[in-house]
């Protein structure tokens, strides 16, 4: 059996890359224990212009008797000539950057993580971000003695130009809106092709936006990310700022992926600034926001996996004001340690997190403030236990779904 496996998803470290990485290692482990495994080859489809971000998964580093590599730069005709039995496309959105994948002739299992651009377009989230995202109408300059000074741009012309640039970057002028069209063309190429997605919400979103038949979409929850044994034993952060924060033992609410505007960090920070006036012993910690907006706001740089693990483990609670999620890894990362979750109530969040979090509308600062005020030491244990319980339930489903997904990939093997 010849399996073509998507390594294009690994060009940067994100949720889709973690997904593909986890499925790859689960598949490889299964193959190693199959009878007549010497008849199976896993060929990793990579792009020599955008190599995997994971060092151990680079073509020169991943040496295994069942694994080889093929470069997409060689052309689809050469790839089709190898007569692969199945192509596992770990992030179908990447077909937008590689439209030639629509010409593959083998059976394909396509993973649609979400319909983010379609959701943005249909619900005017682009416009919301353009007006509310991370200080997009604020310029930064260096003043006397290196002090950073911020000011509003008053000129309507400049404000309009900034808005126009922003909405173009967010797809309202069609950039990004057609990211899934090439993947859909590949999907429709063969009757036995199938779409896999990561939540029932995403399944229904695909059906709504693309008129795909329900029985052609299979829901398999995103598998738990890979944790190294080194991370389990890690007790000291390598980032000095995080280390000082942990050693101080202050209560902090954690917000991750703060550089991504869809995570809605600015609005949550506005709510937390008011909250900190009523709860004097708490801080909010963002990862990758790029600035600190008030005294109780601590911004960390992008963290290594082990440091992020410790940041989750040491936080008081996770604050997750995201405007869109197809699945939602970060809350589960925190729930692993029994941390209470304050989460937006949109998209897949209620499905994945069930009744464990304190929910709020991400559109209202007062709603976020209300959620913050709803958690205190008197009910902390209650929400902590609910997080731990829900994490275990989802983890079991993740394990079962991952095993079933590997079965799907190996379906042609006998």
What are the language-model segments listed below?
Residues 1-414:
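Carbohydrate transferase catalytic cores enriched for Leloir-type hexosyltransferases
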């Amino acid at each position: 059996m010849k399996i073509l496996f998507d390594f294009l998803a690994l060009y940067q470290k994100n949720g889709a890359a973690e997904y593909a990485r986890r499925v790859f290692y689960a598949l490889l482990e299964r193959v190693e224990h199959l009878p007549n495994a010497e008849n199976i080859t896993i060929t990793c489809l990579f792009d020599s212009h955008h190599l995997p971000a994971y060092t151990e998964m680079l073509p020169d580093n991943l040496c295994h008797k069942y694994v080889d590599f093929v470069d997409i730069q060689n052309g689809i005709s050469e790839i089709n000539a190898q007569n692969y039995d199945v192509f596992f496309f770990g992030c179908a959105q990447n077909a937008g950057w590689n439209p030639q994948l629509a010409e593959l002739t083998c059976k394909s299992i396509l993973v649609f993580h979400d319909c983010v651009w379609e959701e943005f377009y249909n619900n005017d989230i682009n416009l919301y971000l353009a007006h509310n995202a991370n200080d997009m109408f604020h310029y930064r300059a260096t003043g006397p003695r290196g002090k950073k000074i911020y000011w509003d741009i008053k000129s309507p012309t400049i404000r309009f130009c900034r808005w126009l640039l922003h909405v173009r970057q967010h797809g309202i002028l069609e950039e990004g809106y057609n990211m899934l069209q090439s993947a859909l063309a590949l999907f429709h190429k063969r009757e036995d092709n199938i779409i896999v997605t990561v939540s029932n919400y995403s399944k229904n979103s695909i059906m709504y936006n693309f008129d795909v038949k329900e029985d052609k979409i299979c829901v398999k929850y995103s598998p738990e990310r890979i944790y190294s044994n080194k991370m389990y034993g890690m007790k000291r952060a390598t980032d000095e700022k995080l280390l000082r924060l942990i050693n101080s033992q202050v209560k902090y609410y954690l917000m991750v992926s703060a550089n991504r505007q869809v995570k809605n960090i600015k609005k949550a920070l506005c709510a937390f600034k008011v909250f900190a006036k009523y709860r004097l012993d708490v801080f909010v910690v963002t990862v990758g926001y790029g600035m600190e907006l008030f005294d109780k706001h601590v911004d960390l740089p992008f963290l290594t996996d082990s440091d992020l693990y410790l940041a989750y483990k040491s936080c008081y609670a996770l604050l997750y004001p995201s405007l869109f999620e197809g699945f939602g890894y970060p809350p589960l990362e925190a729930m692993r340690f029994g941390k209470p979750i304050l989460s937006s109530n949109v998209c897949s969040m209620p499905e994945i997190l069930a009744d464990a979090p304190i929910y709020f509308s991400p559109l209202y600062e007062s709603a976020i403030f209300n959620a913050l005020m709803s958690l205190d030491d008197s009910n902390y244990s209650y929400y902590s236990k609910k997080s731990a319980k829900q994490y275990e339930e989802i983890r079991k489903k993740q394990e079962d779904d991952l095993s079933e997904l590997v079965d799907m990939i190996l379906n042609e093997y006998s």
